[in-house]
């Protein structure tokens, strides 16, 4: 009795019963895995913004995260991507990034900060920065807590934006779109942990 109690679990069972239990566990895993995957996909589909469903057919949910800076909660971010998306070539794929803000920000401040972050990935001339900043201020509204801003990256075309589900404009400049979405998706981002969370599971 003492030896049996100390033995690893299952070692005292007859071989035929052990085999039967292993088969049952395997069958259970095969049944549960597709179910769990289906539930996860259904939950993701249920929260898919209508503008994403319309603008990016077959969008696949990727990652989500919350940005905190010095303890302050800034926004929640969610990313959807087109089939075949690759992290290292994010600028070649369609993607939708949603930011649900947790604090208030002026449109001018968002635009100015965006230029600062975009400069981490490329040199931007003062004239180009001024033009893009003006374009962003034209498109972006002032933000209140719980407001939702969503951007769609259109490779080779530019970027379109929605505010609380309503279209607010687009910036038809592929270079702008690449650098703007690079704020979150480029290896040069100032928030590598956020990038990793958004791109979790993405092919490289």
Protein language model regions, located:
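Intrinsic low-complexity/disordered segments
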Residues: 3, 15, 28, 38-40
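Terminal leader/tail segments of proteins
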Residues: 39-204
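Bacterial N-terminal signal peptides
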Residues: 21-34
